[in-house]
């Protein structure tokens, strides 16, 4: 059985934990940003959310879409689609004993790409900014998966 103190002393695992915390915090901020834009623009997706602004027919005018709210919401969904695989594969990769400098480079590239992707999505910056940052992050996750499968799972 693995001694938990050894895992907590491992440089790669602690780097992964640090970068995972950063990227999860960023993803949580996207939830807050979505709520902020919904409240300030009075745009809601569910009838029960409109109660504070009116009743009956008056409340229905707040059930609409808004370009800004939708942009933030799509950026958040994109985070969910990319960060969750990174967390799973990154955890397994960090526990597989990779070279520390290579592993930390993977983690930094992913976090940097996802932060830039959010900036490119919300600003919005012209393409291919968002696409390039997406593919960098996706490529990092694929690279970790490949290295993990090749070195530890004997494929």
UniProtKB/Swiss-Prot annotation:
User: Which residues are annotated with the PTM N6-acetyllysine?
Assistant: 42, 55, 60
Query: Binding of glutathione: at which residues?
Result: 38, 73-74, 76, 81, 121
Which keywords accompany this UniProt record? Acetylation, Endoplasmic reticulum, Membrane, Mitochondrion, Mitochondrion outer membrane, Transferase, Transmembrane, Transmembrane helix
Q: Which residues point to the Lumenal side?
A: 3-9, 97-99, 149-155
* Catalyses which reaction(s): RX + glutathione = an S-substituted glutathione + a halide anion + H(+)
**Subcellular location, principal:** endoplasmic reticulum
Free-text tissue specificity from the UniProt record: Highly expressed in liver.
Where found?
Endoplasmic reticulum membrane; Mitochondrion outer membrane
Domain of life of the organism encoding this protein = Eukaryota
Please, one GO biological process term?
glutathione transport
What GO cellular component entries does it have? azurophil granule membrane; endoplasmic reticulum; endoplasmic reticulum membrane; membrane; mitochondrial outer membrane; mitochondrion; peroxisomal membrane; plasma membrane
**Could you tell me which Gene3D superfamilies the record lists for this protein?**
Membrane associated eicosanoid/glutathione metabolism-like domain (1.20.120.550)
Q: How does it sit in the membrane?
A: Multi-pass membrane protein
A GO molecular function term, named singly, is: glutathione peroxidase activity
**TM segments?**
10-33, 63-96, 100-123, 129-148
At the top of the EC hierarchy, this enzyme's class is transferase
The record places the following residue ranges in the Cytoplasmic compartment, namely 34-62, 124-128
E.C. number(s) listed in UniProt: 2.5.1.18
User: Quaternary form?
Assistant: Homotrimer; The trimer binds only one molecule of glutathione.
What does the function comment of this entry state? Conjugation of reduced glutathione to a wide number of exogenous and endogenous hydrophobic electrophiles.
* Family (UniProt): Belongs to the MAPEG family.
Name this polypeptide is given: Microsomal glutathione S-transferase 1
The UniProt gene name for this protein comes to MGST1
């Amino acid at each position: 059985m693995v001694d938990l103190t050894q895992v907590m002393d491992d440089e790669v695992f602690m780097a992964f934990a640090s970068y995972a915390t950063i990227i999860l915090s960023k993803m949580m901020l996207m939830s807050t940003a979505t709520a902020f834009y919904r409240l300030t623009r009075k745009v809601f997706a569910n009838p029960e959310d409109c109660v504070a602004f009116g009743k009956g027919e008056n409340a229905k005018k707040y059930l609409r879409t808004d370009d800004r709210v939708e942009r933030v919401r799509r950026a958040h969904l994109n985070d969910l689609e990319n960060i969750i695989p990174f967390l799973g594969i990154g955890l397994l990769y960090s526990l597989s004993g990779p070279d520390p400098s290579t592993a930390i480079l993977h983690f930094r590239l992913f976090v940097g790409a996802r932060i830039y992707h959010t900036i490119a999505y919300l600003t919005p910056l012209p393409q291919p900014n968002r696409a390039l940052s997406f593919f960098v992050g996706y490529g990092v996750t694929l690279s970790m998966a490949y290295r993990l499968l090749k070195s530890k799972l004997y494929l």
